Structures are given as structure tokens and as C-alpha cells.
Amino acid sequence: MQIDKLRGKELDQLFNSILSLKDLEECYRFFDDLCTINEIQSLAQRLEVARMLREGNTYHKIETETGASTATISRVKRCLNYGNDAYEMALDRVKETETESSSK
């Protein structure tokens, strides 16, 4: 994994801080303090690009709907094809949570 080069106390602290957040509102507050609006939007955009790629959408449609560049779309697609399956894991879990919430 590329991130292995960064492993250490500071990154562990960051990830453990994120894992400690209890709900969506705490996430909004934490990321508002931690990141710029553009950084948050970029992260959210990449996740949406991954979701759309998994659904089989074209680069053109993804670019039009998300504003992502073809370079970003290609980078996300490369991660989907050759990465650590983390996009799939996260998107599957979000989908499960949404399904559980809608069935209540």
C-alpha cells in the first residue's frame, strides 16, 4: 500500500480520531475544523466518482454530474481496479446502512 510510507504516530492519531467520532454531526464538526472546504469537497467527489464508476457510468456523465476531471476519474478507476478494495468496502457499508435505515 502506498500509505505504508506514511504509517506512524501522527497518521494513527488521525485515523483513530476519525474512528472515535460517534455520528454524522460529529463528522461534520471534525472535518470542518480539520480540512478546508475544497479538501472536503475533493474527498466527497472522489467517493461519488467511485460510486458512479461502480454503477457503470461513463466518464462524460461522471464529469458532467460531479465536475471531476478525467484525471481524477482515471485515478479513482485505477484504485477501483488495482487498489485495496477500500472504495468497495466503504460504499457497500454505506449502502447496507441506508438499506437498514429505510427498512425501519
Curated annotation (Swiss-Prot):
It comes from the Bacteria. One of its GO terms (molecular function) is DNA-binding transcription factor activity. Transmembrane segments: none annotated. It holds the Pfam family Trp_repressor. InterPro entries: Trp_repress, Trp_repressor/repl_initiator, TrpR-like_sf, YecD_YerC. This is Uncharacterized protein YerC. It comes from Bacillus subtilis (strain 168).
